[in-house]
């Protein structure tokens, strides 16, 4: 792919996202989703590797089906109510179809099958876009229609996503697949609270985006596509590996790191809504995710493979500093002290 095309595609992603999140009309929102889909496909397949082309094909087919469902849902609602306004989703069939369509776009269980495979076939920075930016427009549609959605259905999908994301990530060795199942698990936390507190769901997504971006950028810096590559990178980038360990623990939701805050607030809100069994279930299921985060952290810092080379330069290999990675990692680790202020806002 021509390198000059990359900025155009990234700008198209920004344009599509802006159109979707700022529109109140279903057709405009659908147009933004389609712009996003068409812009990300060349970024997925730019390496021309057969796996990348396969990932792009899977992504296109899945997103095309989801977009058709979004359009069909909005048309059904307009037929029944005469309204094209996104917030006026009142028809029960339309609500069900929209929930299924957005679940496909986000990769929620039981429509998650495409997401790990597409992420595994994509470059690390494209995988970052798929895990963060590409989830924002569909999530915005869910937030705008949250009052019309079925809480029981979303709770069931959320618990299933948290369980499957943790369970399937246990035996993975590829970092992109681990982060894909991590994304599915985090989407479960967002989905379970979305109907009861949309602001808290949005806060959880923002913090997830910050932490996941820090992990992807750190992995891209050390070129780690699997656990063994993380294992041997310590001798070259010890500071970055230590930071990566802390960000992974933050993603796991361990105090006193940033990732603990949204899970704490979600469990508190679920308890207020008299959903204590659901709060207990999702908290217990998140322990599955904790295991593979700990395994990643263990490989990144605690283990050190036998090193037969006596060449000292590898211990002092200079890497160009990355300011965005440093900022995102700092936010991923140090935001918890601000939680009382954030809680007051929410």
Swiss-Prot record:
Keywords, comma-separated and alphabetical: Electron transport, Membrane, Mitochondrion, Mitochondrion inner membrane, NAD, Respiratory chain, Translocase, Transmembrane, Transmembrane helix, Transport, Ubiquinone
Membrane topology according to the record: Multi-pass membrane protein
Catalysis performed (reactions): a ubiquinone + NADH + 5 H(+)(in) = a ubiquinol + NAD(+) + 4 H(+)(out)
EC category: translocase
Listed GO CC annotations: mitochondrial inner membrane
Transmembrane segment boundaries: 25-45, 60-80, 95-115, 124-144, 149-169, 178-195, 200-219, 247-267, 274-294, 326-346
Record-listed E.C. numbers: 7.1.1.2
Any one of the GO BP annotations: mitochondrial electron transport, NADH to ubiquinone
GO molecular function terms attached to this record: NADH dehydrogenase (ubiquinone) activity
Pfam families noted in UniProt: NADH_dehy_S2_C (PF06444), Proton_antipo_M (PF00361)
Subcellular location: Mitochondrion inner membrane
Function per UniProt: Core subunit of the mitochondrial membrane respiratory chain NADH dehydrogenase (Complex I) that is believed to belong to the minimal assembly required for catalysis. Complex I functions in the transfer of electrons from NADH to the respiratory chain. The immediate electron acceptor for the enzyme is believed to be ubiquinone.
Family (UniProt): Belongs to the complex I subunit 2 family.
Protein known as: NADH-ubiquinone oxidoreductase chain 2
């Amino acid at each position: 792919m021509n390198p000059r095309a990359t900025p155009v595609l990234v700008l198209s992603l920004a344009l599509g996202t802006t159109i979707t999140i700022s529109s109140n009309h279903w057709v405009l929102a659908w147009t933004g989703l389609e712009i996003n889909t068409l812009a990300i496909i060349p970024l997925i397949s730019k390496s021309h590797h057969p796996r990348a082309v396969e990932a792009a094909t899977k992504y296109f087919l899945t997103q095309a089906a989801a977009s058709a469902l979004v359009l069909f849902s909005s048309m059904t609602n307009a037929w029944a109510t005469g309204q094209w306004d996104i917030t006026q989703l009142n028809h029960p069939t339309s609500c069900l179809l929209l929930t299924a369509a957005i679940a496909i776009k986000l990769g929620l269980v039981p429509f998650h099958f495409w997401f790990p495979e597409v992420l595994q076939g994509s470059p690390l920075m494209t995988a970052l876009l798929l895990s963060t930016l590409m989830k924002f427009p569909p999530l915005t549609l869910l937030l705008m229609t949250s009052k019309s959605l079925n809480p029981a259905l979303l709770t069931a999908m959320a618990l299933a996503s948290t369980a499957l994301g943790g369970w399937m990530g246990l035996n993975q060795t590829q970092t992109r697949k681990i982060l894909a199942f991590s994304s599915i698990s985090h989407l479960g936390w967002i989905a379970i609270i979305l109907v009861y507190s949309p602001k808290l769901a949005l806060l959880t997504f923002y913090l997830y985006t910050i932490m996941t971006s820090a992990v992807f950028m750190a992995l891209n810096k050390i070129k780690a596509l699997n656990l063994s590559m993380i294992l041997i990178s310590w001798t070259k980038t010890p500071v970055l590996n230590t930071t990566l360990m802390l960000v992974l623990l933050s993603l796991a939701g361990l105090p006193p790191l940033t990732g603990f805050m949204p899970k704490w607030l979600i469990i508190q809100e679920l308890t207020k809504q008299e959903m204590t069994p659901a709060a207990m279930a999702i908290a217990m299921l998140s322990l599955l995710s904790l295991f593979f985060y700990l395994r990643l952290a263990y490989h990144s810092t605690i283990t050190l493979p036998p090193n037969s080379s006596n060449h000292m330069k590898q211990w002092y290999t200079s890497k160009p500093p990355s300011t965005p990675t440093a900022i995102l990692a700092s936010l991923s680790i140090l935001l918890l002290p601000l939680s009382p202020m954030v809680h007051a806002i929410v």
